[in-house]
């Protein structure tokens, strides 16, 4: 099986005003607030045609600043396949990355920063991967939040 980075999966926005942001995506764009994994931080997922395309993270109760290098857009995500191959590629190139499994889900992720500091999230459906074990390692602190 080869390596492929597919279509845009979703984008993530860190906000200090979750309610107004949810309202905008519902009222203005017509998205629907829907199910979200039980992450350790508050937020909301907004759906289009049954797909969570906008992830919102509430940072209003933290001292966490909005990243100046990416503004309110935190990362860009792509549906992908070839999890092990991508990890090998990143390691061969000497690139720091973070891999993890979504809590309670069948989704594996790799996070890596582009040369401009934009975080790229690569999502892999575990059932479609030919690897024996779920991701557990952490390479540097690229992180999703």
Over which residues does each language-model region extend?
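Vicinal oxygen chelate
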Residues: 1-4, 7-16, 44-47, 65-145, ...
């Amino acid at each position: 099986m080869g390596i492929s980075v597919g279509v845009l999966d979703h984008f993530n926005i860190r906000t200090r005003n979750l309610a107004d942001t949810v309202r905008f995506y519902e009222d203005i764009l017509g998205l629907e607030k829907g199910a979200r994994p039980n992450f350790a931080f508050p937020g909301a997922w907004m759906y289009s045609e049954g797909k969570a395309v906008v992830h919102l993270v509430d940072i209003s109760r933290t001292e966490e600043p909005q990243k100046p290098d990416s503004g309110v857009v935190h990362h860009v995500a792509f549906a992908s396949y070839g999890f092990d191959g991508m990890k090998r590629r990143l390691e061969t190139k000497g690139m720091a990355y973070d891999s993890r499994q979504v809590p309670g889900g069948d989704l594996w992720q790799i996070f890596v920063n582009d040369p401009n500091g934009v975080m790229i999230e690569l999502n892999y459906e575990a059932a479609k991967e030919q690897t024996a074990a779920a991701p557990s390692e952490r390479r540097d602190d690229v992180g999703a939040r």
